[in-house]
Each structure stands twice: as structure tokens, then as C-alpha cells.
């Protein structure tokens, strides 16, 4: 017996609005310049409208609407901070999205 979980279109639209880039710019996230935060989602504010849920040890759900891509990263990084892996994780997610966009 499979259960289905659906997120309402209204909830997704609310998340996609993003948060205040001005407020976020005052935070301590140097790798995330130009981003915002809304409803527990980190908004890249990139051309693809990508957004991500981030766990403290590198767990990630990365959604890129333009590339029709969802990446789920299960992780247990020894450092309890995403800044420990952002330098390679974030460019990797973008590279996969860029590649997928070339295949459409």
C-alpha cells in the first residue's frame, strides 16, 4: 500500500517568491551571495529559480525547476555546517542542471 504525499501548488508558489535578499545579505553565509530564505527553503535566486532544503550535516534537497531536476543528497559530513561542503556541492548541483538543460 503506497501513500502519496503532495505539496499544494499554492505552497510551492509561496516558496518560490523567495525572501528578503537584503536581510539575507546581512547573514553569515559568504558562499550564498544573492540568496534568500523563505519557509525553511534556501532560494538561490539564480536564473533557474533553484531552491534547496539543507540539513546541518550536508543533507540536501535541491530543486531546479528550469532543468526539471531534483537532487536528494544523503550525507553525514563530519562538520556540522553546510559551509564545509558548499564550495563543491553547490557548483556540482548547478553543473548537473546546466547539463540537463542541454538535453532538452
How does the language model describe each region?
Residues 1-6, 10-70:
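Active-site Gly/Thr loop motif
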Residues 50-104:
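Structured C-terminal helix/loop/strand segments within mature extracytoplasmic catalytic/sensor domains
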Amino acid at each position: 500500500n503506497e501513500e502519496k504525499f503532495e505539496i499544494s501548488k499554492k505552497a510551492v508558489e509561496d516558496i518560490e517568491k523567495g525572501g528578503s535578499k537584503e536581510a539575507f545579505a546581512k547573514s553569515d553565509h559568504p558562499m550564498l551571495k544573492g540568496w534568500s530564505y523563505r519557509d525553511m527553503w534556501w532560494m538561490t535566486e539564480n536564473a533557474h529559480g533553484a531552491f534547496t532544503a539543507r540539513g546541518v550535516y550536508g543533507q540536501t534537497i535541491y530543486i531546479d525547476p528550469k532543468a526539471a531536476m531534483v537532487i536528494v543528497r544523503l550525507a553525514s559530513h563530519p562538520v556540522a555546517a553546510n559551509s564545509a561542503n558548499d564550495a563543491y556541492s553547490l557548483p556540482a548541483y548547478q553543473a548537473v542542471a546546466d547539463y540537463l538543460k542541454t538535453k532538452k
